């Protein structure tokens, strides 16, 4: 708002005074961050963080898309952001358990970010701090998700949001501090078994075939839901 020299930025939920480097009202999620001022911007790191009204799932613009970056600077949702928001909303409708996973991530004290994959040949993945994961420490994550392709690196065809549900299970495990490295008798990580069970809930809704393998290894039938 440049009228009459006020020069405040409208962020939707709050207005920001650039001269002070502070919002003019308190953060509605202030109770989640007792160590910080309720008027601060981006966790006091405006270079590395973006304020998104306090939500704990952050959908970032496609890092490879110049148009996406331009739109985000002017306060618009980009094509990628709109698509991911729609996928998250549909996942909530698809299955109650998956809906609870998403809701708990949204309510988490950790920040869970969803952004576009950097290399489509490698497919979706979830980035975590491996040291924290090994120690069972709760943490935030970055999910790299491609909502535009139905073909996995393995060659399998499936609905894109099936892959998102898989990665969100990893985010949930990281958030809960349960992203440890236990394996099945034939060497499949239990975190992957949980993620496969989660995505199979969505496959039932999309009509995609039930997944029973991780890579070339069969998941023990007794562990499949």
How does the language model describe each region?
Residues 3-7, 12-14, 18-64:
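Short turn/helix-capping motifs enriched in Asx and small/polar residues
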Residues 1, 26-27, 153, 187:
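Residue-level detector of alpha-helix boundaries and kinks
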Residues 8-10, 32, 38, 75, ...:
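Intrinsically disordered, low-complexity N-terminal regions enriched in serine/proline/glycine
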Residues 68-74, 80-225:
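Catalytic toxin/effector domains delivered as secreted proteins or via bacterial secretion systems
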Residues 1-10, 19, 132-139, 144:
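Short, ordered secondary-structure scaffold segments
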